[in-house]
């Protein structure tokens, strides 16, 4: 493999992650039920029966075993070393492993004990800081306006922390339908694997293909009808892993294009998060207040069932990932053209789904005797939400 690319090590790493995750999910389900780490039906959740969460535990174990297989292959089978010096970074891989452990532990504790938002954010920041201290950071970028590079200095730390925390949360926020976050991360990780192989980053390639194997195995249990959810232990881990992989690739060249490509790959959850912020600001409510205006909610409201909605979002992700891969291989004029097409297409789909418009409800005004559309900041909205929930429970009891 030293002289020409061999995919046998990557296949072994992916297989190790797949098999481990596949075999441990049933054990994790029993553990989650025992610990009462269960998602019960509610007005914001799609599931109609209790589903165990904590699925990230199986994904985490899959990644751990995959890393062990890679290390053993390097020692005993002559595989090329993954933990090689980075051309721009001095990465401490034990510190990177510790950051993954911290982000998983944060999500797992939240799955079991329900952390406060600030506590969960603190865990994410800690994990990102550990990764930064371990050398995973954007220290320099190519100046897009003049020849040369821009050294970020101490700004590399806050910029990288914000980047990793943001990447972590965009996956967490879109985890709303069976198999949605898992499938999106599977598509993104495979795309990043192909880019890592082309750029010669064996560490990023091994980690991304391990993540792909774990996602593929978990999807067997998580696709509709799901028997287990990722939970925050999984969604936080997947988002953090994708962010870390993107930095391993991005930091190699520090070019503006290489900074944009991972954002295109993760375009769907980024659009979903950005539209949620705009939508809630327009409705005059806190950006942290949950609503039913996410992509998957809008598709369900359009009349699609869970499977159809998830498959449509998969198709959107594949389109963006294919575009990102193409941008990575062509010259500047074609890059601009591809990016423009992707941006216009995504904007048109977002507009069709009314992603940036406040969530509305019909409300019968007893004083005026008229049907009104109310936004979440109107007290009548909560009345209609409660009435809808009561009707849902009544239908459930009748069954």
Regions flagged by a language model, labelled:
Residues 2-273:
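"…together with the soluble PPM/PP2C metallo-phosphatase catalytic core" -> "…together
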Residues 301-319, 327-328:
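Alpha-helical transmembrane segments of integral membrane proteins
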Residues 248-255, 341-358:
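N-terminal hydrophobic signal/anchor transmembrane helix of membrane proteins
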Residues 27-52, 275-307:
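Cytosolic, membrane-interface loops and tails of multi-pass inner-membrane proteins
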Residues 266-274, 322, 348, 352:
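Hydrophobic transmembrane alpha-helical segments of multi-pass transport and channel proteins
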